[in-house]
């Protein structure tokens, strides 16, 4: 909630340094495996980045975005979910995509996903804990890095969340 207050006041300060995105994604993967030991899942990191590439970004905030997208993929899926985290360069920009085969999101809700406190209505058995701030924070962070974040989803087929930021 502190981050939300800072966003509202436009007081988020980025502390950019060179970061190793594949290492960061692997760390989040390990962390989530510990947090969700009772939910069978597979997380694959597909690293298509040039060897040794480092990106100039705020590591703490970018790691938060990656964690939020990966954790949402776990939370909003049934047991056995397969999550693919793809890391690549497109037009000299870092592209990170998190794809799952989970519940998916209806088009009418996709427009509102990045709105603060918005939560997709779910059936009682699909309802998850949360405040509806993670995607709004992620959008803010990516925008502050000069990038963009988007979603592609279909109900019953899963979702792909992608963000793109400059490498420098």
Indicate residue ranges for each PLM-predicted region.
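A conserved beta-strand-to-alpha-helix junction within the catalytic ATP-binding
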Residues: 15-30
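Short conserved segment of the HATPase_c
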Residues: 105-117
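Short helix-loop "hinge" at the ATP-lid/N-box region of the Bergerat-fold HATPase_c
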Residues: 73-74
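Conserved micro-motifs of the catalytic ATP-binding
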Residues: 9-14, 52-57
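Short alpha-helical Gxxx[C/S/T] motif in the catalytic ATP-binding
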Residues: 134, 138
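Conserved glycine-rich
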Residues: 146-147
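Short conserved segments within the C-terminal catalytic ATPase subdomain
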Residues: 35-46
